[in-house]
């Protein structure tokens, strides 16, 4: 069972989607959730420290989710952060690109709380969280 005090950063340019993910995380018992509206905003917050998990959209202005993921994986201080991609990009090549870039998991929108919980639990299990 993962620590319910884990600090999540939800990254999406659509505020309604950020709120949906935040509320689903709260339903699952995770109340320590902050938001960022794009990859640039997210990186600034991540580099300030203290986050344990990133849930990111793919399509965003300024820096998309894939570039954010690649930047996280090449940053020594952030490289081990779990990153769950939550996106409308359902094409096989997108899923492969995310996996090759180091995504910890991938959820296609729209999704249910059960789907999110299942993906999170798989990541927690794999990382021993």
Swiss-Prot record:
Binds 1 Mg(2+) ion per subunit. Involved in the transmission of sensory signals from the chemoreceptors to the flagellar motors. In its active (phosphorylated or acetylated) form, CheY exhibits enhanced binding to a switch component, FliM, at the flagellar motor which induces a change from counterclockwise to clockwise flagellar rotation. Phosphorylated by CheA or acetylated by acetyl-CoA synthetase, depending on which acetate metabolism pathway is available. Residues 7-124 form the Response regulatory domain. This is Chemotaxis protein CheY. The gene is cheY. NCBIfam families: PRK10610.1. Pfam families: Response_reg. One of its GO terms (molecular function) is metal ion binding. CDD domains: REC_CheY_CheY3. It comes from the Bacteria. One of its GO terms (biological process) is phosphorelay signal transduction system. It comes from Yersinia pestis. The keyword Phosphoprotein applies. Its main location: cytoplasm.
């Amino acid at each position: 069972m993962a620590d319910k005090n884990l600090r999540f950063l939800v990254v999406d340019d659509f505020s309604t989607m950020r709120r949906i993910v935040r509320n689903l995380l709260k339903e699952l018992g995770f109340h320590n959730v902050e938001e960022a509206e794009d990859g640039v905003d997210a990186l600034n917050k991540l580099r300030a420290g203290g986050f344990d998990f990133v849930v990111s959209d793919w399509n965003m202005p300024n820096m998309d989710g894939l570039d954010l993921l690649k930047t996280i994986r090449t940053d020594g201080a952030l490289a081990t952060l779990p990153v769950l991609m939550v996106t409308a990009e359902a094409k096989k090549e997108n899923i492969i690109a995310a996996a090759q870039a180091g995504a910890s998991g991938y959820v296609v929108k729209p999704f249910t709380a059960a789907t999110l919980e299942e993906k999170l639990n798989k990541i927690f299990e794999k990382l021993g969280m």
